[in-house]
């Protein structure tokens, strides 16, 4: 074999190529470790066509300090993205390299829709998140949602439907509860509490709705349609609670008469439609 010139040339050429490749790799590794490529800046900006109301660049930098390492070449972008997305009020982040020593981060901020259970909020995408409610604007009053874990999207969907149904009555939802039995209760802006009963659509949460939820919707629409006539016959009495679970109507609980009227009028029993 060693007398074969072609074989010897092939081996020599192969060794030469490997040697050059090793030298190139060593050179690249040496250059990559130069201080020139140490990350010197992190640019933080909002996603296109959005604004940041709760996320400050200073708070983000403080929160991610020491969370990931490396230089322009070696930084793990997925690890960096996860670090940024762990910052309160950050829903999603994208991270890219900007030559020669900068990371550019685009942040999508959480859009709070309601308070969720004990100590979380829920966003407009139907996702639960944790952040400081004390950072909300002073004039922002959020409704309060309660429900089992994993029902966030369903609760947001039902909230949107309820808001649409009660809008003609100049009422909005102040509190929405989905209990472990998947029955709903609502408190409206006028303080009236509604027992809505079980929602067939809640047994299989679907952000696009299910035909099985029709009976649930029908109960509410029946109440909304009847309310203008019913309220006109209450003689100024306040309804504290409405039970919509009856198959052919609903029952009302009335607040007690003021003391000055109690002697002139008997308390009326709950009405049923």
Curated annotation (Swiss-Prot):
Keyword terms of this UniProt record: Cell cycle, Cell division, Cell inner membrane, Cell membrane, Membrane, Transmembrane, Transmembrane helix
Periplasmic side: 32-273
POTRA domain sequence ranges: 37-110
Alphabetical list of InterPro entries matching this protein: Cell_div_FtsQ/DivIB_C (IPR005548), FtsQ (IPR026579), FtsQ_C_sf (IPR045335), POTRA (IPR034746), POTRA_FtsQ_type (IPR013685)
Membrane topology value: Single-pass type II membrane protein
Main location: membrane
GO BP annotations listed: cell septum assembly; FtsZ-dependent cytokinesis
Sequence intervals crossing the membrane: 11-31
Lineage: superkingdom: Bacteria
The keyword Iron is annotated on this UniProt entry: no
UniProt keyword Nucleotidyltransferase, yes or no: no
Topology feature Cytoplasmic, residues: 1-10
One protein family per Pfam: FtsQ_DivIB_C
PROSITE patterns, A to Z: POTRA
GO cellular component: cell division site; plasma membrane
Compartments, as annotated in UniProt: Cell inner membrane
Family membership noted in the UniProt record: Belongs to the FtsQ/DivIB family. FtsQ subfamily.
Subunit structure: Part of a complex composed of FtsB, FtsL and FtsQ.
Function field: Essential cell division protein. May link together the upstream cell division proteins, which are predominantly cytoplasmic, with the downstream cell division proteins, which are predominantly periplasmic. May control correct divisome assembly.
Name of this protein: Cell division protein FtsQ
Lineage start: Bacteria, Pseudomonadati, Pseudomonadota, Betaproteobacteria, Burkholderiales
